[in-house]
């Protein structure tokens, strides 16, 4: 999978993909002190960046993880967090890399469709840029 991260295209890592991305770019993911399963509330950090554009600052997402990213890798910033997981979402705007600990594809993630639409728009902007 590492070869995909060398491509010059936007990439969205979800759950284990988020953790893999953190490892690839120089940080480790490890066992979560408090694994999360089911609905959880995340809070955006700042405006949440382009991935969370048009979504509220607090939202319900679906979690299913024993491991987590505890600190973002160099060049990445935290764009969403929760009480039990500091890095619910991260981004590196320069590389167009985004990681989500939660599952936007699950219906229980309130604004999952918006997140995917925003990612498609990020891809379109990268293609035209």
Pin down the residues of each PLM region.
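Cysteine-nucleophile active-site neighborhood
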Residues: 1-54, 60, 113-117
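Catalytic cores of nucleotide-enabled group-transfer and carboxylate-activating enzymes in metabolic
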Residues: 4-8, 20, 90-106, 122
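Short aromatic/basic micro-patch
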Residues: 36, 63, 101
């Amino acid at each position: 999978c590492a070869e995909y991260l060398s491509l010059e295209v936007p990439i969205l890592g979800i759950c284990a993909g988020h953790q893999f991305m953190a490892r690839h770019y120089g940080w480790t993911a490890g066992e979560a002190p408090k694994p999360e399963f089911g609905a959880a509330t995340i809070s955006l950090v700042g405006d949440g960046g382009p991935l969370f554009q048009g979504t509220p600052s607090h939202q319900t997402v679906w979690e299913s993880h024993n491991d987590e990213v505890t600190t973002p890798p160099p060049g990445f910033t935290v764009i969403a967090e929760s009480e039990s997981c500091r890095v619910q979402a991260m981004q590196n705007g320069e590389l167009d890399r985004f990681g989500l600990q939660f599952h936007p594809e699950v219906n229980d993630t309130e604004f999952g469709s918006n997140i995917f639409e925003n990612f498609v728009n990020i891809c379109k902007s990268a293609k035209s840029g």
